[in-house]
Curated annotation (Swiss-Prot):
Keywords: DNA-binding, Metal-binding, Repeat, Zinc, Zinc-finger. This is Zinc finger CCCH domain-containing protein 66. A zinc finger (C3H1-type) spans 66-94, 111-139, 157-185, 318-346, 364-392. The keyword Metal-binding applies. Residues 434-443 have a biased composition (Polar residues). Residues 1-23 have a biased composition (Gly residues). SUPFAM superfamilies: CCCH zinc finger. InterPro entries: Plant_ZF_CCCH, Znf_CCCH, Znf_CCCH_sf. One of its GO terms (molecular function) is DNA binding. Residues 1-30, 405-454 are annotated as: Disordered. The lineage of its organism: Eukaryota, Viridiplantae, Streptophyta, Embryophyta, Tracheophyta.
Length: 454
């Protein structure tokens, strides 16, 4: 009996040591694992995983909850605090709920002794909410909401730097929350902005803007205010929408009128004669037939020599800096008021050595057609462009002009220095030069009448 007990005891000791053998070397069977052992192991594993995960609902970290004290910013961001129970700030049990409540109520942490949140002082808001580590004085935030807005809805802060993006593009994605200064738009920008509106409409009031055409009315829906940027003016003389068939007639428009001024006061008083512009269709009452042709300008309508920017100059004048070469060539500058070079109001531009069409663009029959002009009807290089700008390129989608009538596509030129006549192309591949005295009397009929006049 004692031996049996000893054997049993040896078996128990061996089992406890994990060997499973008796001291005598006789192998003993391991005891079976019951279902209760599996349940205990699973529960321990689940508790271990929850401890590692640090679940929000099972937090038992020793962080003090101090009602009335500012929230611990590090704890609110990460859920941890290295100071533990010695931290003097508040640690709410459910920090996610506390952050959401602070954002909904518009409450921001009041941390006396910390630097003031500059973004909160200027805009009255803070994107970090309750997690911001700076001080948010509520009495100063009320003054931030009283900032004056310009006509476009952007804040004017005279004591701050000017918004560089706003000066270049006329827009600001931060809107009223931008911390920089947004001055009132210049007269030139407002004038260009209002150039496409009728006298009875306002450029700043949203709504429907109808442009009467010769065939149909084109209504443009506008849901936001636009400003003419120095490079690509919005709602300006440049048509930004391709209009099918029902084309638009804009009286008294020249795409280069605001950019180029005549050097002679007498030339400024001369006006074009019954001019049809890009995107317009010839009226049935006109004397040019149904071909949608362009009447030539009177003498002196195309400026040469000294080009001046009319109205207020939106580009900076820096006499002690080199001249902006791009501005001297095109009259435009994509950097706007932040450009570091000199932009003189009067710039000497060499007179083009070719004839110009009624839009002020050069006609170079031997050169390739300007790709940008053929697509959009404009050219930023103006009379200095080295490519050809034929008027026939603009005459697309004409339902009244037969396809085979090629003779109706001809150049209409305005006289320029060194070119006493007007070059006509009757569609036969030959060019004819007409004296200036006879060019004003050329009837706009078929190609035969033009050849007889030459």
């Amino acid at each position: 009996m004692a031996a049996g007990a000893g054997a049993g005891g040896g078996g128990g000791e061996g089992d406890s040591n994990g060997g499973g053998t008796s001291p005598g070397g006789v192998s003993a069977a391991a005891p079976a694992i019951g279902p209760h052992h599996l349940g205990v192991a699973a529960a321990e594993e689940a508790m271990w995983q929850m401890t590692l995960g640090g679940g929000e609902s099972m937090e038992s970290t020793p962080y003090p909850e101090r009602i009335g004290e500012p929230d611990c910013s590090y704890y609110m961001r990460t859920g941890l605090c290295r100071f533990g129970m010695t931290c003097k700030f508040n640690h709410p049990p459910n920090r996610k709920l506390a952050v959401a409540a602070a954002r909904m109520n518009g409450e921001y942490p009041y941390r006396v002794g910390q630097p003031e949140c500059q973004y909160y002082l200027k805009t009255g808001t803070c994107k970090f909410g309750a997690t911001c580590k700076f001080h948010h004085p509520r009495e100063k935030a009320a003054l931030a909401n009283r900032v004056q807005l310009n006509v476009l809805g952007y804040p004017m802060r005279p004591n701050e730097k000017e918004c560089a993006y706003y000066l270049r593009t006329g827009q600001c994605k931060f809107a009223s929350t931008c911390k920089f200064h947004h001055p009132q738009p210049s007269n030139t920008m407002v004038a260009v902005r209002n150039s496409m509106y009728s006298p009875g409409q306002s450029a700043t009031s949203p709504g429907q803007h109808t442009y009467p055409g010769a065939v149909t009315n084109w209504t443009l829906s506008r849901s936001a205010s636009f400003i003419a940027s120095p490079r690509w003016p919005g709602h300006s003389g440049y048509a930004q929408v391709i209009v099918p068939q029902g084309l638009v007639q804009v009286p008294g428009w020249n795409p280069y009128a605001a950019q180029m001024g005549s050097s002679s006061p007498d030339d400024q008083q001369r006006t074009p004669v019954t001019t049809q512009y890009y995107g317009s269709r010839q009226s049935e009452t006109g004397g040019m037939g149904d071909h949608g042709m362009y009447q030539s300008y009177q003498g002196g309508s195309v400026p040469v020599g000294v080009y001046t920017v009319q109205g207020e100059n939106i580009f900076p004048e820096r006499p002690d800096q080199p001249e902006c070469q791009f501005y001297m060539k095109t009259g435009d500058c994509k950097f706007g008021a932040v450009c570091k070079f000199h932009h003189p109001k009067e710039r000497l531009v060499p007179a083009p050595n070719c004839a110009l069409n009624s839009l002020g663009l050069p006609l170079r029959p031997g050169e390739p057609v300007c790709t940008f002009y053929s697509r959009y009807g404009i050219c930023k290089f103006g009379p200095n462009c080295k490519f050809d700008h034929p008027m026939g390129t603009l005459m697309y989608g004409s339902a009244t002009s037969p396809r085979g009538d090629v003779s109706s596509m001809h150049y209409q030129l305005s006289p320029s220095p060194g070119h006493p006549g007007i070059l006509l192309d009757g569609g036969s591949g030959r060019s004819h030069r007409v004296p200036q005295s006879d060019s004003q009397q050329i009837p706009s009929g078929d190609g035969n009448a033009e050849r007889e006049a030459s």
